[in-house]
Amino acid sequence: MSFDVLTINPGSTSTKLAVYQGDKVLFEETVRHTMQELADFNNVQEQFDFRWQVLRRVMDAHGYDVKKLQAVVGRGGLLRPVAGGTYMVTEKMIDDLKENKYGEHASNLGALLAKKLADELTIPSFIVDPVVVDEMQEIARISGNAFIARKSIFHALNHKAAGRKIAKELGKDYEKMNFVIAHLGGGISVAAHRQGKAVDVNNALDGDGPFSPERSGSLPMNDFLEACFSGKWTKRELHELIVGRGGMISYLGTNSMLEVEAKVQAGDVKAIEAFDAMAYQVSKEIGACSVVLQGKVDAIILTGGLARSELFTNKIIEQTNWITSVIIEPGEDELEALNSGVQRVLAGLEKEKEY
């Protein structure tokens, strides 16, 4: 039996929507948001009405009768650490997301948007494999200072979806494979997947690992400490330098990799330097994850929107293909993964979890 399910994936620079009937896509649309459109909002929660209007416009444009929906699923946001799986959206979850209790990110709006529409229709709302899925081995949590532990915050949904898809193409189970998977998008996360579990991964949100189009990644600690006490920036402004205005925005004033590539191909020295450095840092993180797996790596998988860039992925391949084969799985299977999780629950093949 198949079910009509709306999937909602709010990202830092886009809102992605699709309606599925079973595993068939009835329609899918990605709405891109420019920096100018989002500049008027002081925080993610202020974007709720804007994203809600985007959702309603897309549904109306496709002429889909929302009363046919049997469930709504949103991308999971920053919650307390949880096991992988499909979760019913609860009031406790909504409260934590509205308060940004565990951090602020556009994905926090996924459950809020899903529940608003689902409640209007009196149908269930879910999230699947949120970014806080935590499967890290204990040694990976040790940071180097006893008062700080490393956290698992990454693009779990797309990592898992890409891992399962490639494993299936190789005729094996994801749970029996060792992969290094790199999600390349507005944020970048690189994880060591050992037999179905992401046992080590950089915190792709809060300043850890490679820099990305809009995030700073790891920074020299003492220099950042000096900035914190310089009096030039507030705490919020410093946080924005790490999460929303770091990386390529900091170096080139844009988070559009299409613009960056155009500058690279035009011979812009600053653009070439930043572009090469980002590929270098991703490659270095892939190498580190290969060590976590003790060199027993079945494949390196490059996924996410930036994996569509042949110029960017070629630079990573050149630096990492001595480890093992590099497989490009461009784009994101996140909407499909959200739908699959809910279809399994609605069909009674899997039980939903409670937050």
Curated annotation (Swiss-Prot):
One GO cellular component term: cytoplasm
Gene3D superfamilies named in the record: 3.30.420.40
Record key words, sorted: ATP-binding, Cytoplasm, Kinase, Nucleotide-binding, Transferase
EC number(s) stated in the UniProt entry for this protein: 2.7.2.7
Any one biological process term the GO annotation gives: acetate metabolic process
Cell compartments where the protein resides: Cytoplasm
Entry annotated with the keyword Nucleotide-binding: yes
Chief localisation class: cytoplasm
InterPro entries (alphabetical): Aliphatic_acid_kin_short-chain, Aliphatic_acid_kinase_CS, ATPase_NBD, Butyrate_kin
Family statement drawn from the similarity comment of this UniProt entry: Belongs to the acetokinase family.
NCBIfam families referenced in this protein's UniProt entry, alphabetically: butyr_kinase (TIGR02707), PRK03011.1-5 (NF002834)
Name the record gives this protein: Probable butyrate kinase
Organism: Listeria monocytogenes serotype 4b (strain CLIP80459)
